[in-house]
Swiss-Prot record:
Enzyme Commission number, as recorded: 3.1.-.-
Gene name in the database record: PA
Function: Plays an essential role in viral RNA transcription and replication by forming the heterotrimeric polymerase complex together with PB1 and PB2 subunits. The complex transcribes viral mRNAs by using a unique mechanism called cap-snatching. It consists in the hijacking and cleavage of host capped pre-mRNAs. These short capped RNAs are then used as primers for viral mRNAs. The PB2 subunit is responsible for the binding of the 5' cap of cellular pre-mRNAs which are subsequently cleaved after 10-13 nucleotides by the PA subunit that carries the endonuclease activity.
Name of the protein in question: Polymerase acidic protein
GO biological process: cap snatching; symbiont-mediated suppression of host gene expression; symbiont-mediated suppression of host mRNA transcription via inhibition of RNA polymerase II activity; viral RNA genome replication; viral translational frameshifting
Amino acid sequence: CFNPMIVELAEKAMKEYGEDPKIETNKFAAICTHLEVCFMYSDFHFIDERSESIIVESGDPNALLKHRFEIIEGRDRTMAWTVVNSICNTTGVEKPKFLPDLYDYKENRFIEIGVTRREVHTYYLEKANKIKSEKTHIHIFSFTGEEMATKADYTLDEESRARIKTRLFTIRQEMASRGLWDSFRQSERGEETIEEKFEITGTMRRLADQSLPPNFSSLENFRAYVDGFEPNGCIEGKLSQMSKEVNARIEPFLKTTPRPLRLPDGPPCSQRSKFLLMDALKLSIEDPSHEGEGIPLYDAIKCMKTFFGWKEPNIVKPHEKGINPNYLLAWKQVLAELQDIENEEKIPKTKNMKKTSQLKWALGENMAPEKVDFEDCKDVSDLRQYDSDEPESRSLASWIQSEFNKACELTDSSWIELDEIGEDVAPIEHIASMRRNYFTAEVSHCRATEYIMKGVYMNTALLNASCAAMDDFQLIPMISKCRTKEGRRKTNLYGFIIKGRSHLRNDTDVVNFVSMEFSLTDPRLEPHKWEKYCVLEIGDMLLRTAVGQVSRPMFLYVRTNGTSKIKMKWGMEMRRCLLQSLQQIESMIEAESSVKEKDMTKEFFENKSETWPIGESPKGVEEGSIGKVCRTLLAKSVFNSLYASPQLEGFSAESRKLLLIAQALRDNLEPGTFDLGGLYEAVEECLINDPWVLLNASWFNSFLAHALK
């Protein structure tokens, strides 16, 4: 029921404050109404050559008339302040603190127009309290035909005001006929009142004076300077006001401005996670009920016994830099020592490996440079930190996208129980527990959830062993537990790790370990992925397929690796990823619910026909079911944990700035930038060799390409 020009102005005003007219419909209607009243207030009112105020409804082209009212409302902020400033300069009227709506050339005063769905008196007082200016005239209209103005001076004649009241009544009727009036009437918020300046005295005052920026003598002096800051002057001016050294040219950011991120060249990047992901193979027992069930070593031996295809191991993909026979000997030693355990009367709860030469080599025993007390060497003239090589650039390889896709998939087992995501501390309100249950149902079978539980188990076991058996080369089975579709419990063994010496004093002190993990993946298919591994062939496994049983070689992926107390602490807390992705989903539900003005949790999860945007790929925006969205968000969170690195930290922080600028452009907010080149540099210096960061950068490029089409 508003004309297109008013609608357009209102949309622009809301976008300027980052609000969406489609979501905040009541606010949108209020802005349209207010604009229309301001325009009607000024319509037909002129000042003639004798400076008399007259009303002219039909245009007489030869009359020398000047508009009686200057319209300030409806202009963008910069323009509006320019108009206000020029009026103040030419008329000498005091400059208002807030942008008024109109200026009256006859009475020489600014006017603040209010349109309220509440009591006119209430609203009038709020307005007066907010603007605190004797000089600005206030005029309030209501939808019920009441009005109130400063000193009961209504500025306009009866007829002009009646026109406005009639229009407001019409708007109310139109809204009521569409069932919108009640919600509109109830949604009005009071004016935010700005508190009086309160005095700061005593200690706080001294602290305030001490903490001023340089060149300011007192708090008053600084306040005056800040108050003189035009809130909507151009940024260049502000910067030069702040410092003489800064000179920034604001460049408009257009669809053609951004270029794609430059991904590094070089050999393809390699796998660097602490354990195998999509390539892992499990030896499993169902419904475990053996003696000592739950003791990792007992479980591991039981799992090992389910496999009968062991054979003499041999190296199929050597590690470029390592002494490969040592990896082979290490595996043989594990098999032999497990055999020894079984020959004992009573199986021990933990197993410490013999400190053989192959294990000492693999675990870097005695490799650390000797530490010397600083007192003994501070006189050495050329004392310096030894040079470390720049990391070698690596290019994006396709395996990391495959890893991510696999992490989003469903497995045939459930990896968490319903109450895994946080226990109810208080009687949680019904909606929250309902959301949690829906979400858990979508992600409990997800492969990313398996990675969480595997990571939690491995880090907990390793941290325990690091503290409990500092000097020992302890054998730690890599285990996880799940439930089958039929609800039967299952214990899985992925392989083993052997921990090195672990006198961890600081959070960042490193404990070395050797990991040995089962797999059916032939490393020769993507040798670049396995650069850091030595891979052995250790057996043949019979697999049931559609065409009957086939035999596949079983591989063992062996590598040396390291971690620290702080990394293990975070690894133990990987369940947080479930919470993080649940919160992201909740904010999507909240957005839907606020549009529909009711809780949309049930519809959100149960409307199977609806698709949601998941991410960008070179093909465009990918869409999927709500379950797929849950699993994708979870997988992202899990990969951020599995592939955590300084490169990821830097890339996330810096690329976010670029993302916000691109989104502002998408929302037609006309963003401007300075030193965009510097921002690109900051993002690109994080693109070195990390597979997850490189994948995110390539996704980012897809986003840029589509967002700015």
